[in-house]
Every structure is written in structure tokens, then in C-alpha cells.
């Protein structure tokens, strides 16, 4: 049997390292993306062909048209596996796998990694702690939630990635008024209790239903605060061997098992209740984390999550044994902010610990630092946050829907 053929789906511009990693295995690599992304700098040297879908006004695809196009392509080209490179492509890939009976995650399991309501129900039923929540289907259930669970609450979309579309609510009256504004879209949202706490993320690779690599990090400002308070985004690897790391590695493995994860990258978020110190599951996804967290993980560990995810997918399809690269145990941290300047000059940041700069996105500044000492990483991130706030920072309202 020859090397497998992969159809990669990306409705946003991302995943070039995945495409390169896949091509490095000798696999055939096809990419399907939105027509509006035709002129983005895709890793074309890694592609055997690229196909475009005419997107709708909100970047949606007509999946019946996509299926018809793929059916035509498959008359002459063999497709062995389909991979979604972004959260918003998980359902597309699952639909196509089901329709063409291609191995991989189907539509039911894919909901565990895309639908925030399905995630909470699945986690709760598996005995994993989650914040108190309710669907927004039945008025009496919502009224019961509002009368028994102390405010504040968060109303959040079931399907969006990141903190887009969320609203903090402080009373039952405010909740009902907000649900009125959602109208017929209400069923696409859920409500859950908001408890202040620190938010952590586990970025991992799974093979054969087991987590084979993971790094635990802490957001130094929560994603919600950054998105809605116009803050500065920061994250750092937690201390190795710490109680927090051990608990979160265990919880992450429990989530992956409960949700039916077999093989993929994953990005999973947890919150540590400020009052009790207990961890609660927030959400997960079967993809590499956004906001350049993959670059931070690579700086700390030497593992490029995009590249290794591709190698893992190919090994499963071949089938061959997947082997991780050599892993390093350094500490790393990231800082990213909107800027007033279109192309900010970052030359004032010249510490030897800097290993990465965000240079291809206008009105943004981003830096990753690495050190064998976590204290040094935090010291630098704290210093940089003050300087970014003073010399560069700009804020914009959080969008209702993602823009990239």
C-alpha cells in the first residue's frame, strides 16, 4: 500500500506547519479553503492541489456543494483521510467523513469538541466537575437555573471558538432581557455560572485513545477579560511537577477519554475556583490552540504541535508507529496585544530570552520568551506588560463572531 492521501479543510488561514509536516511523511496533501483566502501565503510547496469554496457573507460553506465537488474529485483521486485545521471546520470534516464513509471522527463525537453544551453534558455525566449550567430550550428550566444558581452568569454561544459572543449577566431580569435580544437564535446559546478564577489550558497530542504529549499553561489574564476588557493576552507554562500540573494532566486525560478522543491535537481549558481552589472543566477542541500558543509550547518543549499532529495523523492512516521528537523541559511565556501603531517597532525588547516575535500581523505586538527558570519568564512578561501598556497598547470591542 502506498502513502495515504489527506484532504485538509481550512476556512481560516492557518495550519501551514501541519501541511508541511504531512508532506514530510510522503503523503499526498490536498487543501480545501475559502475562495477569499486564495492569495494568502499557503505552504503551496507542501500541497499536491488546492481547491476553493465560494464562502457566504459570514464565511459559511454550502456543504452539499462541497460534497458534490469532492465526489467529482474522488472519481480520479483517492482520499484516505480528512482533517479539519480549525474549530469551525470540525463539523465540515465530520459531515464529509460520514457521507463518504472515510475513517475518523464522526458527527456525534465531533459535537463533543465543538458544541459547548454537549461538552458540559458529556463531562458532567463522566463525573468531571463543570460550572453549573443550563441549556436555553425550556423557559421553566431557565427560570429554575436563575432561581437556584447564584449570579453572575455567562451567556455564551454553543459553537464559537474563543471568548467571542459571550455576555456577563448579573440578574434574572437582565438574563430574560438578553434572551429576548437573541430571539430565535436562543437555542444556539447556553448559560452557566460565572465564578472568578484563574484559567489554565492543556495543549496535547493523543494517539490510540491515550494522551502522548501535554503541556499545562496558565493564562495570566483570562481570555474573557482580555476580549471584553481590552486587556493584554499573556500565558506561561506552569511549574513542572506542581500540584496544579498533576491535577490538570489527570483531568485532561479524563476529558479526552470521556469525549472519545482517539488521535488528534487538542486544546482544553479549565478554571481554578478562586474560593475553593478546585478545578472545573470549561471547554475543549480537537485542534491546535490559537493565539500563537503552539509557538509558546514549541519554545518550551521543542514539539511543534501542528507538525507533529500531521505526522501522527499520517502514522495512524499508514498504519505506522508514531514517535515523538525529543522533548525539552524549559519554561516559556507569551504576550500579545493590539497596538496603536500599524507596524510597531519592537527593538526596545532585546532580552536574550526572546525566541519569537509576531511580525506578520498589523496593529499587533507579540513576543515569546524562554528560560530554564519560570521566575525569569514571569519577570519578563510582567515587565513587558507594563511597557506594552505604556507604549503600544490599543483595545477594540470584542467581536460577536471571530474574524480570523
Say what each PLM segment does.
Residues 98-165, 170-172:
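A conserved helix-loop-beta module that forms one wall/lid of the active-site cleft
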Residues 15, 142, 308-404:
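Peripheral (often C-terminal) accessory segments that flank ATP-dependent C-N-forming ligase machineries
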Residues 1-109, 137-140, 317, 382-400:
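ATP-binding N-terminal substructure of ATP-dependent carboxylate-amine bond-forming enzymes
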Residues 129-131, 152-155, 164-201, 216-217, ...:
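Conserved ATP-binding module of the ATP-grasp superfamily
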Residues 173, 193-261, 265, 272, ...:
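ATP-dependent carboxylate/phosphate-activation module, predominantly the ATP-grasp catalytic core
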Amino acid at each position: 500500500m502506498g502513502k495515504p492521501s489527506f484532504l485538509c479543510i481550512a476556512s481560516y488561514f492557518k495550519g501551514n506547519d501541519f501541511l508541511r509536516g504531512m508532506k514530510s511523511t510522503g503523503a499526498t496533501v490536498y487543501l480545501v479553503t475559502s475562495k477569499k483566502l486564495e492569495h494568502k501565503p499557503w505552504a503551496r510547496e507542501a500541497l499536491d492541489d488546492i481547491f476553493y469554496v465560494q464562502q457566504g457573507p459570514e464565511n459559511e460553506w454550502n456543504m452539499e456543494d462541497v460534497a458534490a465537488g469532492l465526489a467529482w474529485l474522488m472519481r480520479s483521486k483517492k482520499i484516505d483521510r480528512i482533517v479539519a485545521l480549525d474549530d469551525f471546520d470540525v463539523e465540515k470534516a465530520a459531515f464529509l467523513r460520514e457521507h463518504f464513509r472515510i475513517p475518523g471522527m464522526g458527527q456525534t463525537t465531533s459535537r463533543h469538541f465543538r458544541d459547548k453544551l454537549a461538552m458540559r453534558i458529556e463531562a458532567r455525566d463522566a463525573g468531571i466537575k463543570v460550572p453549573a449550567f443550563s441549556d436555553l430550550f425550556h423557559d421553566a428550566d431557565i427560570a429554575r437555573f436563575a432561581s437556584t444558581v447564584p449570579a453572575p452568569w455567562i451567556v455564551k454561544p454553543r459553537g464559537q471558538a474563543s471568548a467571542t459572543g459571550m455576555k456577563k449577566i448579573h440578574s434574572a431580569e437582565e438574563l430574560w432581557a438578553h434572551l429576548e435580544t437573541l430571539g430565535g437564535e436562543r437555542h444556539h446559546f447556553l448559560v452557566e455560572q460565572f465564578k472568578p478564577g484563574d484559567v489554565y489550558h492543556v495543549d496535547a497530542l493523543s494517539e490510540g485513545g491515550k494522551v502522548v504529549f501535554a503541556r499545562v499553561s496558565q493564562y495570566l489574564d483570562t481570555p474573557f477579560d482580555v476580549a471584553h476588557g481590552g486587556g493584554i493576552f499573556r500565558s506561561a507554562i506552569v511549574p513542572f511537577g506542581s500540584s496544579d500540573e498533576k491535577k490538570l494532566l489527570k483531568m485532561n486525560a479524563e476529558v479526552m477519554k470521556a469525549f472519545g478522543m482517539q488521535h488528534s491535537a487538542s486544546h482544553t481549558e479549565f478554571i481554578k475556583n478562586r474560593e475553593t481552589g478546585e478545578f472545573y472543566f470549561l471547554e475543549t477542541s480537537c485542534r491546535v490552540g490559537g493565539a500563537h500558543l503552539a509557538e509558546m509550547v514549541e519554545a518550551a518543549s521543542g514539539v511543534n504541535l501542528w507538525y507533529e499532529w500531521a505526522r501522527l495523523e499520517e502514522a495512524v492512516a499508514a498504519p505506522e508507529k508514531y514517535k515523538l521528537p525529543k522533548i525539552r523541559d524549559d519554561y516559556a511565556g507569551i504576550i500579545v496585544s493590539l497596538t496603536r501603531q500599524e507596524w510597531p517597532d519592537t527593538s526596545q525588547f532585546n532580552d536574550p530570552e526572546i525566541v519569537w516575535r509576531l511580525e506578520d500581523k498589523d496593529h499587533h505586538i507579540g513576543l515569546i520568551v524562554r528560560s530554564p527558570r519560570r521566575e525569569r519568564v514571569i519577570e519578563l512578561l510582567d515587565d513587558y506588560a507594563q511597557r506594552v501598556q505604556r507604549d503600544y497598547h490599543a483595545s477594540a470591542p470584542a467581536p460577536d463572531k471571530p474574524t480570523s
